[in-house]
A protein has these predicted regions:
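Short, flexible, glycine/charge-rich loop motifs used to bind or transfer phosphoryl groups or to couple energy/partner
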Residues: 21-23, 50, 74-75, 115
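Intrinsic, low-complexity N-terminal interaction/targeting segments
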Residues: 102-119, 124-127
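A short beta-sheet element
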Residues: 45-106, 121
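Structural beta-strand/beta-sheet cores of well-ordered domains, especially the beta-sheet scaffolds
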Residues: 16, 28-33, 58-60, 83, ...
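Short loop/beta submotifs within extracellular cysteine-rich repeat domains
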Residues: 14, 40-41, 108-113
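Flexible, active-site-adjacent loop/turn segments at secondary-structure boundaries
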Residues: 16, 30, 70, 76-77, ...
Length: 127
């Protein structure tokens, strides 16, 4: 099977790095995605911040620390916590293809146990 670097397929960006405890929760607000492995990475819904544009729906989130390599396709705009990366496809991809790559990324989780983070190596990771 042929593999390629994550950065060959996706633009790899660091999220907006917000702290949930500094935000106002709002049941009808914007998803707040963190490094959790639960609920598609969404840990709360928060009030929109006028000075911060939410990250776009259709991107893939990857935890660089915490629950390292927890990877999810985000179906709605969202804000992100610390050590969270988001991947934007370089070419058009269906949601099914994005979900496949979520699985490929998550299958590399074993490489980052015992406190190792994926923050430096994510772009060059072979999938």
């Amino acid at each position: 099977m042929k593999t390629c670097k994550v950065s060959d397929l996706f633009w790899v960006n660091y999220g907006v790095n917000l702290e949930l405890n500094a935000l106002e929760q709002d049941m009808n607000g914007i998803n707040f995605v963190s490094r959790t492995s639960n609920n598609n990475g969404v840990s709360a819904k928060v009030k929109r911040i006028s000075s911060v544009e939410p990250l776009p729906a259709g991107t893939i989130t990857v935890a660089g620390g915490g629950s390292v390599m927890e990877t999810f396709l985000q179906m709605a705009p969202y804000y992100s916590g610390r050590d969270l990366y988001y991947l934007t496809p370089k070419v058009a991809m269906s949601n099914e293809v994005k979900l496949y790559y979520c699985h490929c990324l998550r299958s590399n989780k074993y490489k980052f146990s015992y406190g190792r983070q994926a923050n430096v190596t994510l772009r060059d990771l072979q999938i």
